[in-house]
UniProtKB/Swiss-Prot annotation:
Organism this protein belongs to: Oncopeltus fasciatus (Large milkweed bug)
GO cellular component: extracellular region
Keyword Secreted: yes
Coiled-coil region list: none
Listed name of the protein: Tachykinin-related peptide 5
UniProt main location, coarse: secreted
Positions bearing Arginine amide: R10
Expression tissues: Expressed in the antennal lobe (at protein level).
Signal peptide range: none
Keyword terms of this UniProt record: Amidation, Neuropeptide, Secreted
GO biological process assignments: neuropeptide signaling pathway
Localization per Swiss-Prot or TrEMBL: Secreted
Disulfide bonds: none
Length: 10
């Protein structure tokens, strides 16, 4: 799930 948050930060 953390990966999804990483994309949202970009």
């Amino acid at each position: 799930a953390p990966v999804m948050g990483f994309q949202g930060m970009r």
